[in-house]
């Protein structure tokens, strides 16, 4: 049976609970990040999205406007749903919505875990600067011009 995929903005408390549940599973339990590092004051200002397979929320991500451009953050897919292209689909959606919402922005940027850098490279993101530690995980700063 084909999986039915849908992406929605997590704009209700119930949806935000699902966002936080996915992030808790992936970042806190699986990757051992501290909850105090994973959940921050930016959750209140970012736009959050959920990707559903059939009726189950399996991936999430957020973006927000900054002085530099549009920062994409907290991309997470539940482990048993990885490898299906869901993060790619979610990222395409986030970039499309963000670009429409913030027409004046000229770049997307993010801090990629080095292990998933190829995902972002496939989407046209380019590394810059040295790798660095964030929540005890090696990260690489990456950006993509919106007009490229």
Set out the residue ranges of the language-model regions.
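Short amphipathic alpha-helix that is part of the acyltransferase structural core
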Residues: 2-38, 43, 48
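Conserved GNAT acetyl-CoA-binding A-motif
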Residues: 98-112
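A conserved beta-turn-beta hairpin within the catalytic core of GNAT-like acetyltransferases
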Residues: 65-73, 82, 104-106, 133-139
């Amino acid at each position: 049976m084909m999986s039915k995929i849908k992406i929605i903005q997590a704009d209700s408390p119930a949806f935000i609970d699902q966002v936080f549940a996915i992030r808790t599973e992936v970042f806190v339990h699986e990757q051992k990040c501290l909850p105090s590092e994973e959940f921050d004051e930016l959750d209140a200002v970012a736009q959050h999205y959920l990707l559903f397979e059939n009726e189950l929320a399996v991936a999430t991500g957020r973006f927000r406007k900054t002085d530099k451009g549009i920062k994409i953050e907290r991309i997470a897919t539940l482990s048993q749903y990885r490898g299906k292209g869901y993060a790619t689909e979610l990222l395409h959606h986030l970039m499309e919505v963000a670009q429409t919402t913030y027409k004046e922005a000229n770049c997307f940027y993010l801090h990629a875990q080095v292990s998933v850098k190829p995902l972002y490279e496939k989407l046209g993101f380019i590394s810059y600067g040295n790798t660095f530690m964030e929540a005890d995980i090696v990260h690489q700063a990456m950006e993509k011009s919106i007009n490229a």
